[in-house]
Amino acid sequence: MELKDKKILVVGLAKTGVAVTRFLAQAGAFVTVTDMREEEALSDVLAELSDLDITYELGRHVPYSFLMADLIVVSPGVPMDIKPLEMARSQKRRVVSEVELASWFIKAPMVAITGTNGKTTTTTLTGEIFKACGFETFVGGNIGNPLIELAESGQEVSRVVVELSSFQLEGVESFRPDVAVLLNITEDHLDRYHSFQEYIDAKLRIFENQTADDFAVLNIDDPLVAACASKLKAQLFPMSRLHELEEGISYRDGFITFSHKGKVLRFGTEGFKLKGVHNLDNIMASLASTLLMRCDGDCAYEAVKNFKGLPHRMELVEEIDGVAYYEDSKGTNVGSVVKSLESFDSGITLIAGGKDKGGSYEPLAPLVESRVSHLVLIGEAKARMNEALGSLTDTHLAETLEEAVEISRRLTKPGGVVLFSPACSSFDMFKNYEERAQRFKAAVRAGKKGEA
């Protein structure tokens, strides 16, 4: 689509909206930006865009602007079912996401990764493998830089790796990755979606425009993921920790085996720095994606062995008086916390809670009952979590994260583990999950210094 002189409306002025606005303005479009927040709340953002000739509609959405736009680009934080967007679609206005817009201007081969959990680790590792194997690589999307920044920069790259949330996938039309990865699906974001099926449908849009020339990497150990295999137009490339595969990538007895069209590569896992059963899925997905896109096996293996993982994902903070403190603030849904709890056999003090996302906490029940010695709950969700899980183990309610850490310190015996894995978002008490993580680390280290 030619952007010059087109009337384009950008909905939402968070990080992605700012990047889209800058790209469109520099492409010669007539850009209007709308956000429900008032000007005072957006002062920093507006300063970033002060050099551009654009129109602002703040504190409200003006229906006329939606109806007159040649194109509407929606930021991922804005629900697609708000009334102005529904009205615009009913009048045949074109409504897309930033990822869709960016894809029109990016020609390099692309790996796109989605799933409820593990996206960021898999995306980062995939990018590291490509770079180690000599490919000029852009890594972005839901992680780090919006994809549109690659289009804006004009940077020549030979590989693109993009992490995609369900929100970003809602607004795709023609977006077509060469390799699309679906890691897992568990309940999440039910505070935004009307049903779990609606969330699943958003995830599956990653495969919508693929053809038989492309690959779909599916974790067939997840029944919801496996169920979509029959609907694919791309070539299925399965991954599994439970089954040996003649075609695909699988794990058995300390080795990952990649099998594709008669080519077989085996990788020992003993030297991997990235620990945890759940990370085997992330590693297999990264290896599958990069090997399918012409990475050398030895080079890819070395990159995996050297990858240490990311902060806020099962990060060991300190070991104090024989107790290990793990920070897993990125564990914002139940499925993620299940994976984290499975990394320990028993003796866990679990700190959980935050802003309730509307899903069921019942999937945690067997692990809480069998492995969690003490449960400490915080935040807006603590009452509902206590109702679902409180009777299964020794349970305590705390008003602050710092109080939760102090309670955990008193309760946990040497040899035990304090795991902060919230199963909730952070927005009831913190700006984001990073701030929540830093507060947990500070509280842990304050105890080490005897300040608590």
Curated annotation (Swiss-Prot):
Q: Which SUPFAM superfamilies match?
A: MurCD N-terminal domain, MurD-like peptide ligases, catalytic domain, MurD-like peptide ligases, peptide-binding domain
For the keyword ATP-binding, the answer is yes
Q: Where in the cell is it found?
A: Cytoplasm
A Pfam family that this protein carries is MurD-like_N
Residues reported in the UniProt entry to bind ATP: G115, T116, N117, G118, K119, T120, T121
What InterPro entries does its record include? Mur-like_cat_sf (IPR036565), Mur_ligase_C (IPR004101), Mur_ligase_C_dom_sf (IPR036615), Mur_ligase_cen (IPR013221), MurD (IPR005762)
Question: For this chain's UniProt record, which GO biological process terms are given?
Answer: cell division; cell wall organization; peptidoglycan biosynthetic process; regulation of cell shape
Protein name (Swiss-Prot/TrEMBL): UDP-N-acetylmuramoylalanine--D-glutamate ligase
What is the species listed in this Swiss-Prot or TrEMBL entry? Citrifermentans bemidjiense (strain ATCC BAA-1014 / DSM 16622 / JCM 12645 / Bem) (Geobacter bemidjiensis)
